[in-house]
Amino acid sequence: MTKLTFGALVALAMTAAASTAMSSKAMAQDAAAGKTSFNKCLACHAIGEGAKNKVGPELNGLNGRKSGTAPDYSYSDANKNSGITWDEATFKEYIKDPKAKIPGTKMAFAGIKNETEINNLWTFVSQFDKDGKIKQ
């Protein structure tokens, strides 16, 4: 009985370790797919070290940032007064239909409807801190 219990614990630990490794690999794949999706955003936005505002604001440190507060970017009153603090749920709702989430936004983008693509894009964007470095 003791051997069976010990064996079960070892098997459980190995399963948990494999699951964690697969989860990390899946997240890396999601970020890579999100980077590809971000190509749709590059005409207006920048992210990463040295990113600057373009037609749209740079997106470093988006997770936890209040809407309308990227330095040196001229936001619409709608964005400045939206009361939004960016997080995963808010971003996903916004990116599906920006003008529905923030009526009056200057963002001229029809949105992304594919849930997997939205998830991947969030994984990519949210990995950058306010200085454009990838969080560890």
Curated annotation (Swiss-Prot):
The keyword Transport applies. The keyword Electron transport applies. Its main location: periplasm. GO terms for molecular function: electron transfer activity; heme binding; metal ion binding. It holds the Pfam family Cytochrom_C. It comes from the Bacteria. Heme c binds at C41, C44, H45, M107. It is found in: Periplasm. Residues 1-28 form the signal peptide. GO terms for cellular component: periplasmic space. Binds 1 heme c group covalently per subunit. PANTHER family: CYTOCHROME C. This is Cytochrome c-550.
